[in-house]
Amino acid sequence: VSPMKSLVAAALVAVGLPALAQSPREAKPAAAGREALAIPHEKYTLSNGLEVILSVDRKLPIVAVNVWYHVGAYHEQPGRTGFAHLFEHMMFQGSKHVADDVHISMLEQLGGTDLNGTTSFDRTNYFQTVPSNQLETALWLESDRMGFLLDALTLEKLNTQREVVKNERREGTETAPYGIAREKAWQALFPLPHPYHGDVIGSLKDLDAATLDDVKGFFRQWYAPSNSTLTIVGDIDVEKTKALVQKYFGTLPSTPKPALPKVAPVKLTKPVVIRHEERVARLPLLSVQWLTAPYLAEGDAVADVLATALATGKASRLYRRLVLEKQLAQSVSASQQSQGAQSVFSLNVVARPGVTTDTLLKEVDAVLDEVRRQGVTPEEIDRARTRYDTRMLAGLQAVGGMGGKADVLQSYNHFVGKPSYVEEDLARYEKVTPESVKQFTRDTLSNDARVILHAAPPDSGRAPTLPKERK
């Protein structure tokens, strides 16, 4: 999951279809505007391999401390899934020098905010924003769980968090509207043995089978300074901050950087149709999905623009046709879910009572055929750019939290190795044209290489029965 596209929404990873906000862009930002978006920073590496990114922002007397471990569900082995997400929970349970379950409460008592962790297919992150005079405490807490978590990890803690994760899956997938259906579609997009096949929570069978030694081995392999990046943004003195970083992180042992898995891209060679009997939601859902280019690769920005043109706002094509004009749908949505290895473009339509998903599919295909022939208008592209840029600007007002400056620096550093990549990112959207949208829809959103999910409750295709008139 690309965190840069989570400027207004945290990654929702439980069913493999995160609700990722699109990276904001402006229609035609002036050069001065682009320079204003650049984030001044310094990047360096400790002798043990820990990357450090520092950026000064003195608007408020606060500091964001953000740690990314470059490991997610993508890096897990068959039979050992869900470990990265499991550690998202375990990392708050205490370490050698920090008592059990006090990490968050300690920071809150000191005025900390935005305290959380998230897991995606591509990375795991932990973040907090603290008063600038509490920076040292935040660094101590982060360094202690990086270097000494296993000293306090017990089978009892593992079993407790294992049950928490099971309940999270039940709530997020098994009893959620369309949860099981969406999972089936995701698994059809990424068949085994692709590491994107499951959801980030992992297989409950794998979690049940995991031993304490299994879990500790995963931590030793991936949660080392050499596979981590520490970003600090806010009201800091750079030299004093460097000294604190060295004090708390510099003595952690160095280990070789783990090798990344080599996975061939998935290619769909025929349409896959899934018909699921929906037992939770009361209205039918049509979801059509395609495999697309990785985050920041050619085609990723075009997909963002098309998603906005199709289903964002009352003027969008699918909303206008299906909700307003033909009154066949309750809601429509579209997204480019950008990820490190391979992305997914999704169209989702919830039917009105009595309308079938087959009817919706015909209408969706008619709209796509129109785009394949004509592209979209320059005005639609401009609206998309403006929407993205507004969100980018909003995100960069904060130093911490999901989509704040620290997270933006981390995301670009993770995916392209350049923390301040804002100008280059913006430039991708400047290159989108009606012709490029038309070509993308023709070449990538093919009817012959997609997953079509029909999730419908029993008898949902029947026209609603009107109450009998009383005599």
Regions found by a protein language model. Give the residues of each.
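Bacterial N-terminal signal peptides that target proteins for export
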Residues: V1-V8
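Cleavable N-terminal signal peptides
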Residues: V8-A9, A19
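An aromatic/glycine/proline-enriched structural segment found at the starts
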Residues: S23-A27, L150, L192, A224-P225, ...
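M16 family metallopeptidases and their MPP-like homologs
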Residues: I53-S55, L60-P78, G82-L86, D100-F148, ...
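Active-site recognition of the HExxH zinc-binding catalytic motif
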Residues: T81-Q93, T308
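Short, polar/flexible loop-turn hinges at active-site or ligand-entry regions and domain interfaces
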Residues: Q93-H97, G147-E156, G172, V376-T377
